[in-house]
Amino acid sequence: MSVILRILSETLIPVYFVLGLGFYAGAQGRVDNRNTASINVLLMHFALPCSLFLGVARTSVALLHTQAPLLIVLTIAMGLSYTLQFYLNRSVFHIPLKEAAVGSLTSSFANNVAVGVPLLVGIYGPAGLTAVAVGILVGALLLSPITLVILECQDSEQASRPLGKRLVSACFSSFKRPVVLAPLAGLLWLLIGIKIPAPVDKSLDLIGKSTVGLALFLTGLLLSAEPFRLSANVLAGILVKNFVQPAIALALVFIFVLRGDLGREAFLLATLPAGFFGTVFGARYDVRSVEMNSILVLSTAISIVTIPVAYLVSIHLP
């Protein structure tokens, strides 16, 4: 238990430090918290795509085959979480479509990089890194494109066109985005079986490493521009990410009879707090949601308790 607490302190304290730094910079006027377009372009078009490409391309095909059950469990758990949150956002809270989409992404796509990597590598070693890569793969190739299609479909330039044409155009536009093309290119590179040349790997890694810090700083910056809010929508988002998604994953571990570390990794990945993808996508499409940013912050805070509990549960799994 002391090991998990040490890993958590080393993982979550840096997350809150960078969030606080962004908040301070915006609140004190050091950085313009109303004009974040340049930071978002850096994230969405350069840093994040490089990180996603490497995260997928560095995985081996053999490992991908062994991780197939994990891929299935995470796809179902994350997909159901996204669907549930989207339904709540639209039908219960009556949130506009764009905000509903980015809010659902926040509540279903975990902070795999900033929290998942140190947590699972600290517990399971290199195998934990592969499990995290699977989580990123599911989010990047399933949840992100769905969200982008909704955002593109609701773009003001598309509003006057028939629904069918808007959907086709939105799908085409979303798959041209670097954040979707990059993991697809990484998957293609992986299947071809060519090792990434060292200079290319190091070059992409250099900019890719800035992703987490930039995303968390941007979130803090956006929080400084809007009041923090605790609403029914925020509570629902936290409930879905921190409790419902882990419960779904745990049920699927037993349904698919995942034994050993694979089942434990699937469960722990589902317990990770909300990630920054929703914030980044929202900033790109001018969707400024106080609730979305509040979910990210509170979900991370609550994970200080939920992750140790989940770890204790995981060690008793078959």
Name these PLM-found stretches.
Residues 1-318:
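Alpha-helical transmembrane segments of multi-pass small-molecule/ion transporters
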